[in-house]
């Protein structure tokens, strides 16, 4: 009994103590212990909700400065947790994207990688500058010997850099004297095939053997071919000219000495190029006997040609021939073959315009010496002389014809030997010869209309 009383008293005292502590914290509450909730239940509830506190009979909590400070700290922690979650989600998304890229076909990835690599190569090549272009002749010039370089400056007087035809061209000697110290050996792989016959099958065995070929320069013998130009000159003044001729289907080259055409000579003095006037002392001396022989041969050819022309003239028929009517005509000459020698020795001069007029020697032989040679139209006859020589006109037609006299008709009129004396026959023959020979030149003038004798100007003029 005593124990039960003690436990009850202890329970009451503890409850009172607890109530005292809760009352001091939460405020005034009812003295009924059954209505008050337990401490475990109160702490597990959401203290932040005001509805629960009001339903259970608790007064709202009083905020102090410490609780106000704790609220923004909680908000910052929530923001940090959210930012951490966002970062983690982003990392997971990146991993998923990489997995998707790896799941793409490998062929496409290879193409893309090759494109990227080529792009990188092109960019790198643009950055690097290509090496400068060097002409092959410039490369070869770097390996020339000192002598060949001296020839370029010392022997500028001649075209090839040599003093005469006996000496060889500079290009030949310079190339032959090139010395290469770094001689390399070339290794050539030669495949030798050997066929071995074994019973019924053929087996081809290839064996590779290395053959060492020394790299050396083959020197050409001097003067193996003629110089590349047609003439060679020297400082002495004389020069050589390459003359070509054909002999039995072969090309023959001959060196002929010719006078020099160089006006300047080049010398090297104290490292400078000195140009001076060339003094040509060795002039070509021609033999007088050769000149005399050539002149005699030329005169002999001229005499032979003259003799041939004389023989042709003797064999040819007379140029003049008489016809039955008493007129004198000139026969056409036969064409004589013209040779090259005649054309060469033919004298050059002003040719005669009137080629059809006869020469004076021909008239001397064929006609009287008293008759003058006519080189133009016959003089116009006077009216009084014509009136005496002709009979008086009997009809009207004769009077009209006498009034309208034309010189062209007169020149073409046949000769009347009865009215004139016998001494005038040769004169009219000569005039008729002239009229017949020069009739072609008067055709244009004779076609004009007849004019009266009152016109003083001569109409038909030979030009």
UniProtKB/Swiss-Prot annotation:
Acidic residues: bias regions: 298-318
Record localization: Plastid, Chloroplast
Protein name: Protein FAF-like, chloroplastic
Entry GO CC: chloroplast; cytoplasm; endoplasmic reticulum; nucleus
Keyword check for Transcription regulation: no
Disordered, as annotated region: 57-135, 298-320
Keyword check for Plastid: yes
Biased composition (Basic and acidic residues): 117-126
Transit sequence range: 1-44
GO biological process, one term: positive regulation of phosphatase activity
Keywords: Chloroplast, Plastid, Transit peptide
Location of the FAF domain: 224-278
Protein family per UniProt: Belongs to the fantastic four family.
Annotated GO MF terms: phosphatase binding
Organism (species): Arabidopsis thaliana (Mouse-ear cress)
């Amino acid at each position: 009994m005593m124990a039960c009383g003690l436990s009850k008293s202890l329970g009451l005292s503890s409850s009172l103590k607890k109530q005292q502590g809760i009352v001091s914290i939460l405020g005034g509450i009812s003295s009924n212990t059954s209505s008050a909730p337990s401490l475990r239940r109160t702490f597990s509830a959401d203290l932040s909700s005001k509805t629960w506190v009001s339903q259970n009979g608790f007064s709202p909590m009083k905020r102090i400065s410490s609780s106000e400070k704790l609220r923004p700290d909680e908000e910052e922690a929530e923001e940090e947790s959210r930012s951490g979650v966002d970062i983690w989600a982003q990392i997971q998304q990146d991993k998923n994207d990489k997995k998707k890229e790896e799941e793409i076909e490998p062929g496409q990835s290879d193409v893309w990688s090759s494109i990227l690599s080529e792009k990188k190569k092109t960019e790198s090549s643009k950055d690097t500058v290509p090496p400068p272009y060097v002409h092959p002749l410039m490369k070869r010039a770097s390996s020339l010997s000192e002598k060949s370089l001296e020839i370029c400056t010392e022997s500028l007087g001649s075209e090839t850099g040599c003093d005469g035809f006996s000496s060889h061209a500079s290009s030949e000697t310079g190339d032959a004297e090139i010395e290469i110290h770094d001689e390399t050996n070339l290794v050539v792989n030669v495949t030798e095939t050997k066929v071995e016959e074994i019973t019924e099958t053929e087996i081809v065995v290839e064996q590779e053997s290395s053959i060492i070929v020394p790299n050396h320069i083959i020197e050409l013998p001097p003067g193996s071919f003629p110089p590349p130009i047609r003439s060679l000159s020297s400082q002495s003044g004389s020069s050589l000219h390459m003359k070509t001729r054909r002999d039995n289907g072969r090309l023959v080259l001959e060196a002929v000495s010719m006078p020099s055409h160089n006006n300047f000579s080049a010398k090297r003095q104290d490292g400078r190029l000195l140009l001076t006037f060339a003094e040509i002392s060795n002039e070509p001396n021609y033999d007088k006997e050769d000149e005399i022989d050539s002149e005699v041969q030329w005169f002999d050819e001229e005499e032979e040609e003259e003799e041939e022309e004389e023989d042709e003239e003797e064999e040819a028929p007379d140029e003049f021939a008489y016809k039955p009517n008493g007129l004198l005509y000139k026969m056409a000459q036969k064409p004589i073959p013209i040779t090259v020698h005649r054309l060469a020795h033919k004298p050059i001069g002003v040719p005669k315009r009137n080629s059809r007029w006869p020469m004076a020697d021909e008239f001397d032989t064929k006609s009287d010496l008293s008759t003058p040679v006519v080189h133009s139209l016959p003089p116009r006859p006077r009216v009084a002389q014509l009136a005496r020589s002709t009979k008086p006109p009997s009809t009207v037609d004769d009077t009209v014809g006498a009034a309208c006299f034309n010189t062209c008709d007169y020149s073409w009129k046949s000769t009347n030997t009865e009215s004139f004396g016998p001494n005038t026959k040769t004169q009219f023959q000569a005039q008729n010869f002239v009229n017949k020979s020069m009739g072609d030149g008067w055709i244009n003038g004779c076609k004009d209309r007849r004019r009266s004798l009152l016109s003083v100007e001569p109409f038909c003029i030979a030009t």
